[in-house]
Amino acid sequence: MEQLVNELIEADVGRVLVNEPLARYTTMKIGGPADILIVPKHVAGIEKTLQLVKQYKTKWTVIGRGSNLLVSDQGIEGVVIRLGEGLDHLEVEKHKVRVGSGYPLIKLSTLLSRQGLAGLEFASGIPGSVGGAVYMNAGAHKSDISSVLSKALILFEDGAIDWLTNKELEFSYRASVLQTKRPGIVLEAVFQLQAGKREEIVRSMQNNKDYRRETQPWNHPCAGSVFRNPIPHFAGDLVEKAGLRGYRIGGAQISEMHGNFIVNTGGASAQDVLSLIELIKHTIKDKFDVDMHTEVEIIGR
């Protein structure tokens, strides 16, 4: 491992951190250390990292802004690549937007709304990165990434880089082909937006933000929605009908504001959260015969 670290540093791939606590990089403020954390400063840094990872036969994982993650208390084995400031370029040409995967989604939707471009209003309260949003087809307010994405540039596991169209990404509810058949890293995204009235777009975004503030617990560290909605039900409604609102294990608590959120009230461990997730699954199955599936990604040792 030490030799790999030295080669990564010599290759100037970006910041290279050893045994770095991942709680610093997730919105839940939970997570053990990464053996090696890379914050690449350019695409070439990612390519070189993957070359070395293959050479050393080391496991690797990619994270974005950590908004939809629950990282194990034992951390993540191997190399963790965090997409961020090195991949945050932005080009706007009329209605076409080309943006790096590390660009914050809220910042992007806010900026474009002020330019009178419509289509990303739903993302005004999603605290993730563009890359993560494409990877999981993030959405809210009856819309999602698939409704506005034209194509995405992907770095595949074998080192190949290619564009995948909206159709090729095979989007579905909170899912894409990148999670299953064609694993890879989102490097860039191209969105096709529409011209709109600036005042109306900004008002719509503000309404979305206000709704989220009133109904969701953003005053505590959390990872967003824990479960996918088991259509035709809403996950939060089922949790609340089961009488689990406010239930606590250790430092983790099912939010008093919204049943589909688990918050870190202070000092919560990943195991606390996992115990709550299992409690919810079993309770909902027993009471309503509904299977619950997590939307939050659970990773680590």
From Swiss-Prot:
It holds the Pfam family MurB_C. Its EC number is 1.3.1.98. Pathway: Cell wall biogenesis; peptidoglycan biosynthesis. GO terms for molecular function: FAD binding; flavin adenine dinucleotide binding; UDP-N-acetylmuramate dehydrogenase activity. Its main location: cytoplasm. It catalyses: UDP-N-acetyl-alpha-D-muramate + NADP(+) = UDP-N-acetyl-3-O-(1-carboxyvinyl)-alpha-D-glucosamine + NADPH + H(+). It is an enzyme of class 1 (oxidoreductase). GO terms for cellular component: cytosol. Signal peptide: none annotated. Residues 29-196 form the FAD-binding PCMH-type domain. GO terms for biological process: cell division; cell wall organization; peptidoglycan biosynthetic process; regulation of cell shape. The active site is at residues 174, 225, 295. Its cofactor is FAD. The keyword Phosphoprotein does not apply. Keywords: Cell cycle, Cell division, Cell shape, Cell wall biogenesis/degradation, Cytoplasm, FAD, Flavoprotein, NADP, Oxidoreductase, Peptidoglycan synthesis. It is found in: Cytoplasm. Cell wall formation. Belongs to the MurB family. This is UDP-N-acetylenolpyruvoylglucosamine reductase 1. It comes from Bacillus cereus (strain ATCC 14579 / DSM 31 / CCUG 7414 / JCM 2152 / NBRC 15305 / NCIMB 9373 / NCTC 2599 / NRRL B-3711).
